[in-house]
């Protein structure tokens, strides 16, 4: 109804109005003054946007949110901010709800488009605007009758967590701030964007929507409406609750609390499709953080399954988000990060994956890097991890008397240290595996001589430790069923198993042969479909 072309024409700014001292006349003058300064297409868009939100017209709201707003941003406000609140308030009759939603988009635009990022005052104002929005919907005695598209609700929660992350990095960077700015951050703004506020908001949205009870009811085959409550029955609250669970997953991952990150999703069956996973960006973000948490918990089989499933999903559904360039860029970047993480997991825990994913790994030359990692090149592990990991944050700001340094990288360096310590413990295992795969029985002394031609008796004792390490590292907790992603059974992920009797290693190859039939059936069906389409083309 309100496409971008309708707002294509611009008008010049001008200032012809003066105040009279009469409150009524001044209000009218102010409305006319700001309306005159604003381009006509922007003014009409804001008026129609406000009207659509008032009427709860989801189709128009989604069209204007997904299409018209980005188009006007590109045309008028590519490197500048949208009009200030008072300018917009004058033409929408001070509609409180609309102004809160408008400011959410206003500050989001500043974070995304303005060179140098938002100023401290803008960061603080954005925080208080989120507080106004969440207080409006959480503190109400009765549900607020507000209808917003699910994509906006997801991006609102996602942006809320992103701005927390961005502010945590901003306050940790002391080298570009004066002493007065640091004092202001530590004294005047110590509570804004605090981790307690973020967790409190997200948990409150989860609780008020009863989303956990609804998900449990769905998993048991019951009607979720019976446990939804007055608020949770509304799609607005229900979806906010669901997206808040994903927001909590992201927050705990950014803090390095991977156990809690997975635990907070317990009502969601991570490895199954859900009726709530219709927003591609939400599903992809969920899988990224779940897969990363699994990797850091040394549950490589679950991480590989999570990454493989979502990368296949991305391959098959690109057309769903390709029309929105900024979302396309974000998803492509996250997909690239997941390919890096998948490569790491496959080196540490080799196993078969889908042929189409293997094909991408080959085409993008991941195999060269994977070979280097298998040979113990720690720098490749490090570079892959740094590229693909989340941008970790500290829950606490630097102390007021801390040295003037850049503390942004401290959380990431700590997580890198933990990860590389695990890699160092495993870097010799591929060599051990390669020798064991060649034999069914192998004396300990012979294996020791393969590894080191000058091996002594002490080296044989160390070899026992290495073999025990191999056994230990190859046994992972693997999810099999149930709503909790933390549950599972211990399984050996190696392609071979062995036991030691006296000084002899007895080896059994447990590798499952490739099933090429499914691959060729898919290719034949695809070829037949292509052949039918070619025959239907009239030349």
Swiss-Prot record:
One of its GO terms (biological process) is formation of cytoplasmic translation initiation complex. Residues 306-514 form the PCI domain. PROSITE patterns: PCI (PS50250). One of its GO terms (molecular function) is translation initiation factor activity. Keywords: Cytoplasm, Initiation factor, Protein biosynthesis. The keyword Protein biosynthesis applies. GO terms for cellular component: eukaryotic 43S preinitiation complex; eukaryotic 48S preinitiation complex; eukaryotic translation initiation factor 3 complex. It holds the Pfam family Paf67. It is found in: Cytoplasm. SUPFAM superfamilies: TPR-like. InterPro entries: eIF3l, PCI_dom, TPR-like_helical_dom_sf. The keyword DNA repair does not apply. Component of the eukaryotic translation initiation factor 3 (eIF-3) complex. The eIF-3 complex interacts with pix. Belongs to the eIF-3 subunit L family. Component of the eukaryotic translation initiation factor 3 (eIF-3) complex, which is involved in protein synthesis of a specialized repertoire of mRNAs and, together with other initiation factors, stimulates binding of mRNA and methionyl-tRNAi to the 40S ribosome. The eIF-3 complex specifically targets and initiates translation of a subset of mRNAs involved in cell proliferation. This is Eukaryotic translation initiation factor 3 subunit L.
């Amino acid at each position: 109804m309100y496409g971008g072309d309708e707002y294509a024409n611009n008008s010049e700014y001008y200032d012809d109005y003066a105040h009279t001292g009469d409150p009524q006349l001044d209000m009218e003058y102010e409305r006319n003054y700001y309306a005159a300064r604003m381009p006509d297409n922007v003014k009409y868009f804001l008026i129609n946007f406000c009207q659509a939100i008032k009427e709860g017209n989801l189709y128009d709201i989604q069209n204007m949110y997904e299409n018209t707003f980005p188009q006007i941003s590109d045309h008028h406000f590519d490197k500048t901010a949208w009009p200030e609140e008072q300018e917009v308030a004058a033409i929408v009759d001070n509609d409180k709800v609309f102004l809160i939603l408008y400011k959410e988009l206003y500050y989001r635009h500043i974070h995304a488009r303005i060179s140098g990022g938002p100023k401290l005052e803008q960061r603080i104002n954005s925080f208080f605007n989120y507080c106004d929005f969440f207080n409006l919907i959480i503190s109400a005695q009765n549900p607020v009758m507000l209808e917003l598209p699910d994509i906006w609700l997801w991006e609102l929660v996602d942006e809320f967590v992103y701005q927390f992350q961005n502010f945590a990095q901003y306050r940790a960077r002391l080298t570009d701030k004066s002493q007065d700015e640091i004092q202001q951050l530590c004294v005047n703004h110590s509570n804004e964007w605090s981790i307690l506020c973020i967790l409190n908001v997200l948990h409150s949205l989860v609780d008020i929507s009863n989303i956990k009870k609804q998900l449990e009811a769905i998993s048991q085959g019951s009607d979720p409406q019976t446990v939804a409550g007055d608020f949770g029955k509304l799609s607005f609250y229900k979806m906010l609750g669901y997206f808040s669970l994903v927001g909590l997953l992201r927050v705990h991952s950014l803090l390095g609390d991977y156990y809690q990150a997975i635990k907070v999703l317990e009502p969601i069956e991570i490895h199954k499709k859900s009726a709530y996973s219709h927003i591609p960006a939400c599903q992809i973000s969920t899988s990224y953080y779940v897969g990363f948490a699994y990797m850091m918990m040394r549950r490589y089989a679950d991480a590989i399954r999570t990454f493989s499933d979502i990368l296949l999903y991305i391959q098959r559904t690109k057309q769903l988000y390709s029309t929105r360039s900024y979302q396309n860029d974000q998803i492509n970047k996250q997909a690239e990060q997941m390919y890096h993480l998948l490569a790491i997991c496959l080196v540490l825990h080799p196993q078969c994956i889908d042929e189409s994913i293997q094909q991408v790994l080959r085409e993008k030359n991941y195999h060269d890097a994977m070979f280097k990692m298998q040979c113990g090149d720690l720098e490749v592990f490090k570079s892959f991890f740094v590229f693909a990991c989340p941008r970790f944050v500290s829950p606490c700001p630097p102390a007021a008397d801390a040295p003037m340094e850049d503390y942004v990288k401290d959380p990431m360096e700590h997580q890198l240290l933990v990860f590389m310590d695990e890699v160092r413990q495993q870097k010799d295992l591929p060599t051990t595996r390669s020798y064991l795969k060649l034999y069914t029985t192998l004396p300990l002394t012979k294996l020791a001589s393969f590894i080191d031609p000058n091996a002594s008796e002490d080296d044989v004792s160390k070899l026992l430790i290495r073999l025990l390490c191999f056994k230990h590292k190859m046994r992972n907790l693997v999810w099999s069923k149930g709503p909790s992603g933390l549950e599972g059974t211990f399984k050996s992920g190696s392609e071979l198993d062995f036991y030691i009797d006296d000084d002899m290693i007895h080896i059994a190859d447990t590798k499952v042969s490739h099933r090429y039939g499914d691959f060729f059936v898919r290719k034949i069906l695809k070829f037949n479909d292509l052949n039918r389409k070619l025959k239907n083309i009239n030349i």
